């Protein structure tokens, strides 16, 4: 060990312990923060697009109003994206606080909580998108065998806005899957050989 406190390899090459870990940690936290902001914004957008979507159509002198509550899958989509947006906002605040404090590593219990939460949100958003997409296909194409008519031929504006909401929700679910992979990396690297070298926990 030199007087500068820098480890020296047999080849007289200085080795700075923990530097790579800190760089990787900063990049991971930045990617996590960006994804959480994206999920928060797109989740709110998807919920607003679908939740505020209505269209009135007059059929045989009778006015029929299409709402997202007419399809339970769309109600599930709005709720799931609202929950995902709120969850991502809270986690985003946590990321900002951690970056301001300059923390490098966090405790394993907290890492498990974040990992589990991200996994749950990923499954929730993916299932909501899948259910909404299936219902939208029936609304668009109908189901002749069950004598279900093509709803979108009458409520074109309503279906178009729902489609935009589902597209936003799809981006949310994809981002959530990527984020769950990042949280898995952040968790399981704590069990690697480099854990505890930097000594900062939060």
Curated annotation (Swiss-Prot):
One Pfam family recorded for the sequence: CASP_dom
Topological relation to the membrane, as annotated: Multi-pass membrane protein
GO cellular component assignments: plasma membrane
Domain of life: Eukaryota
Extracellular side: 51-72, 133-164
Transmembrane segments: 30-50, 73-93, 110-132, 165-185
Key words, A-Z: Cell membrane, Membrane, Transmembrane, Transmembrane helix
InterPro entries: CASP/CASPL (IPR006459), CASP_dom (IPR006702)
Record topology, Cytoplasmic segments: 1-29, 94-109, 186-202
Family: Belongs to the Casparian strip membrane proteins (CASP) family.
PANTHER family found in the cross-reference section: CASP-LIKE PROTEIN 2B1, CASP-LIKE PROTEIN 4A4
Subunit record text: Homodimer and heterodimers.
Name of the protein in its database record: CASP-like protein 2B1
Species this chain originates from: Populus trichocarpa
